Amino acid sequence: MLDLRLIREHPDLVREALRKLNTEAPLDEILELDERRRQLVAEVEQLKAQRNAESKRIGQLPAGPEREATIAAMRALGDRIEALDRELAAIEERLQALLLEVPNLPDPDVPVGPDESGNVVVRHWGEPRPFDFPVKPHWELAEELGLIDFARGVKIAGSRFYVLRGDLARLQRALIAWMIDLHVNEHGYLEVYPPFLVRREAMIGTGNLPKFGDNLYHDEETDLWLIPTAEVPVTNLFRDEILPPGSLPIYLVAATPCFRKERVSAGRDVRGIKRVHQFEKVEMVKFVEPDRSDEELQRLVADAEDVLRRLELPYRVVQMCTGDLSFTAAKKFDLEVWAPGSQEWLEVSSCSNFRDFQARRANIRYRPSEGARPQFVHTLNGSGLALPRTLIAIMENYQQPDGTIEIPAVLRPYMGGQQRIGRQPAYWEPAQARRAREQARAGDS
């Protein structure tokens, strides 16, 4: 949420920023309501002062017509104040609702552009691996090795759901555990395990509501919402709190499933697991002092890059232009990894600085020092990293001529030393193998 004073005192600046974002917001109505609200506040305060003065005067008047007239005037004042209070409450409610519709403003150094075509590639790391055999996309590898059961995922839950099988399910677990350990042990984050269902207030705090309700899963009976990212519950840990002096920065990391309706054009990304309704993600969230948030954004990007470098996956860092910024971000960098099978760059991390936009919505403040006036924190978040796209990148970059998939070296300790993923057994084969072993042991005895 923007500071109302910024809109009031610099409306042209806000309008110009919205123009760069290629979006609109109800600024005129906000300004009109703000002016009326200020008039009402002044009028109510004046009437209350008048009522207090008349109340003291009544105590000094003897019984008689003048006293009765003053009492009647007092009642009229009370009725007027009550009516104005009702109007003021309605205006404040409407004003708050309108302010929630205004996006964050881009930082001055964000490239200006109409859409993703205006994004700027900041740097590359690594070279795409040369292959001397035909490279397959991840969905072909998955089908040939029995790693993903697409048909049964659809049968269970509908389109864009899937079932990971065997070593790929294990690789996902290993990847999540390794990323969490890296962020905790080397990057200075504290792991948290938050709820996957949140209240409406939490979604409003991070900017997901009211604008993006159509993309969220919602239980109407309880008014609980399935999280689209761990950013929502983790950011709201400190909603309506004042953090004590010396408590910033705070670095938190969480691994959660994410749920999104992901309404996309028919025929787009229909193969594989690139765009799905349920996926896992490791999320980094920061609460920092305002004068440190620029530096902290660069550190956040570096933490996400470290994951990709250790996985030895070629990637690029892309700065979002004004036309491709999210609703809540003042500045955002995406990390895109190269997928040689599908011949495309896949976004596996978005790292954003929200400034005080989320903190105002969620009322998250801190005291710079003892006795100091509370200020809004700055919040940041970034994927570190998102699955299944990181799985896609591993499958396609580490595929071998014999059709197997090499396991990245950093993940092998989390896979019991396993080095490659091959053809997976049928659903019933592990149980049959156990039975055969038990029968063999029984025969030996």
UniProtKB/Swiss-Prot annotation:
Q: Which reactions fall under this protein's catalytic activity? A: tRNA(Ser) + L-serine + ATP = L-seryl-tRNA(Ser) + AMP + diphosphate + H(+); tRNA(Sec) + L-serine + ATP = L-seryl-tRNA(Sec) + AMP + diphosphate + H(+)
Chief localization = cytoplasm
Subcellular localization(s) per the UniProt record: Cytoplasm
Keyword annotations of the record: Aminoacyl-tRNA synthetase, ATP-binding, Cytoplasm, Ligase, Nucleotide-binding, Protein biosynthesis
What is the annotated signal peptide range for this record?
A: none
Pathway(s) per entry: Aminoacyl-tRNA biosynthesis; selenocysteinyl-tRNA(Sec) biosynthesis; L-seryl-tRNA(Sec) from L-serine and tRNA(Sec): step 1/1
Binding residues for ATP: 260-262, 276, 347-350
Q: Give me the residues that bind L-serine, please.
A: 229-231, 283, 383
Q: Which InterPro entries match?
A: aa-tRNA-synt_IIb, aa-tRNA-synth_II, aa-tRNA-synth_II/BPL/LPL, Ser-tRNA-ligase_type_1, Ser-tRNA-synth_1_N, SerRS_1_N_sf, SerRS_core, tRNA-bd_arm
Pfam families associated with the record: Seryl_tRNA_N, tRNA-synt_2b
Q: Which GO terms describe its molecular function?
A: ATP binding; serine-tRNA ligase activity
> What top-level branch of life does the organism fall under?
Bacteria
Cellular component aspect of the GO annotation:
cytoplasm
- Return the Gene3D superfamilies for the record: Bira Bifunctional Protein, Domain 2 (3.30.930.10), Serine-tRNA synthetase, tRNA binding domain (1.10.287.40)
Annotated domain remarks: Consists of two distinct domains, a catalytic core and a N-terminal extension that is involved in tRNA binding.
PANTHER family membership? SERINE--TRNA LIGASE, SERYL-TRNA SYNTHETASE
| NCBIfam families found in the cross-reference section | serS
Assembly behavior:
Homodimer. The tRNA molecule binds across the dimer.
Q: What is this protein called?
A: Serine--tRNA ligase
What organism is this sequence from?
Thermomicrobium roseum (strain ATCC 27502 / DSM 5159 / P-2)
